[in-house]
Amino acid sequence: MKEFVEGWDVVQTLGEGAYGEVKLLVNRVTQEAVAMKVLNRSDLPEAADNFRKEICVHRLLEHENIIKYYGHRREGPLQFIFLEYASGGELFDRIEPDYGMDQADAQKFFKQIISGVEYLHSKGVAHRDLKPENILLDANDNIRISDFGLATVFRYKGEERPLVKKCGTLPYIAPEVLVKSYHAEPADVWSCGVILVALLAGELPWDKPATSCEQYKGWKECKITVSPWTKLDNMALSLVRKILTPNPTKRYTIEQIKGHQWTRKMFEAKNTSSKWLSSTSDSLSRKKSCFDIGQTGDIARDNAPTRVSSSQPDLMHRGDGDGPTPAANSEVLAHGISFSQPAHLEDMLLSTQTQGTQSSSQSPLQKLVKRMTRFFVTTDANETVQELRSLFEKLGYVWKTNSPGQITVTTQDKRKAQLVFKANLIEMDARILVDFRLSRGDGLEFKKHFVTIRNRLSEHIAKGPVSWPIAVATNSVP
């Protein structure tokens, strides 16, 4: 654990990108929690410009479904943005590959996404990179739209301008973005429609919205007897067809989406959230084709410092050059993360907006971001590292030990696009937690790899009850 400024500790790294990192800061006295984005490549004009624009956009926004902005600070070559800490993790983590989620949960998330996007548009702001990796959840599982590195103001003083920059993530962008100037609102609405398909079906409908893509071509020709459309009931499919209309002038508006019968229907909630986590085989039993996205799907990806799903320094070497295995457990556990120990916000910021941060009696243990891609093991830290390295070799992964207790894995998804994730070993309640986090690529594809790893290590995974704070942090509350 490192001190950032007096009274504020860097508890853990939430994400990293080509130009910087996202850190979790916790106040040692008040237990306030703040997410801090760090730009350490201000020598790159484009990165610095995007950072500046992101700050300008954040200053315009204040909505319950938009990540809160607290302020920014500059220290020499480093720049910082301080944001609300969304401890519920990323939306993609709640999507079970090839299955999706219960309709009640999907509807709740979708309605909140739509509410946030409607607010953005009312302020004249277009997000331009809406996808589950850029949507976070707070401690109560409410949506927080984040990552405004590609956002732009499309309406000012009542005058709207067409957009021309081709940016976003290919499976989620609207077809008109690829071919001509476009209007901001219909393009964001299209992205929301693709997110809805992912929520309900656990897969993406196409690689990109172009006639060169067979899946998209089939959709335009109304071929809906194939996956993922067969996973949607008629009511949901009717809404998706209205949103994913190729002609933006005929596409549903947010007001029309809110009035659709699927959006207004009261679905009965089902307790299925823990099923994916607790079972090593349930998600594998649903074997249907899945269209996966990858880094090649990201175009104009110049907002990389913003989040965990952003880009990571390129290809690693195989791990045989990492030196001898440390002898003591403390040396192979992740440094800078402590759950045995736990100045004010305005002391840390310049140019602040004084807003309430998350402050409670929670310990740093409970502030561990919720994630389903983690498990406890029965082995000690040394044995766990050896098991992971051996398995990664067998799976053909390229891996590297970045620091004690952290292994970065590089592989490819089904599209041959790069997929990067990290495995962190954390000592918690006298046990070893292995925590996997996506760094680059598609979240659904990452979760498939996690399931493979979890199943292959099943004999070493701890079974039985855990303490309540740990259950909360690991999304395993019964």
Predicted features, each with a name:
Residues 76-90, 94:
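Conserved short submotifs of the Hanks-type protein kinase catalytic core
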Residues 11-18, 22:
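Protein kinase glycine-rich loop
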Residues 109-110:
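Activation segment signature within eukaryotic-like protein kinase domains
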Residues 150-152:
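Activation segment
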